[in-house]
Amino acid sequence: DDLLKRDFKADKPFSKCVTDITEVKGKNGKLYVSAIFDCYDLTAVGLSMDDNMIAELCAATVENTTAAYPEFCGAVLHSDRGSQYTSDSYRAALNEYGVRQSMNSAGGRCHDNARCVSMWARMKNELFYSRGRKSTDYTIEQLKTMIWRYYMSYWNNRRICSSIGGMPPAEKRRRYYSDKTGKPAAAME
């Protein structure tokens, strides 16, 4: 079932998350990147990469996310209807962590998972196209490092996102938890 129905706004962390896979061509092959983004603040909460686009890549992303963020358990996680997301191994990972699966409608359109599609476009533009670079100038190992740093360091902590009030995702998250605890955001670190 499509639990999000193209509504990617969330009023708290881990109430709605989205996931997808993208392909990045490297000098020595293809790299497949699977990520989970929190709709609340656009934080990249989970990331896995491999040279094969198999279901286990997506299951590993779920496992990585729950290891880093135990509060992800119980979230709604939206994806397209790709074979990775309908596989037994992926669904087993969701069930193990109590994550509720949401999938776009049969015969869905790119707008059904627009949040992820736009995140991939931004990453490729900011890492490569806007700098006159090509992903094929880099090896798979170099690409893994670049993409990991882009999301986990730059995107989450420093990139200003206009759609969340002109701040980085980590700042919006700090403010949310600061409001809940009554402690200043700086004390939350």
Question: Where are the regions a protein language model picked out?
Answer:
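Short conserved beta-strand segments at catalytic cores or DNA/RNA-binding microdomains
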Residues: 21-53, 63-66, 120
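Mobile genetic element proteins and their domesticated derivatives, centered on retroelements
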Residues: 4, 20, 36, 42, ...
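Mobile-element integrase/transposase regions
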Residues: 1-35, 60-61, 69-74, 185, ...
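C-terminal domain-tail junction helix/linker
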Residues: 95, 121-189
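Hydrophobic (often cysteine-bearing) scaffold residues that line and stabilize catalytic clefts
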Residues: 14, 33, 50, 54, ...
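RNase H-like two-metal-ion nuclease catalytic core shared by retroviral integrases
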Residues: 79-81, 87-91, 103-125, 139-145, ...
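Basic, flexible linker segments flanking DNA-binding modules
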Residues: 1-12, 110, 168-180
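Short small-residue beta-strand/loop micro-motif enriched in glycine and branched aliphatics
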Residues: 41-47, 101-104, 129-131
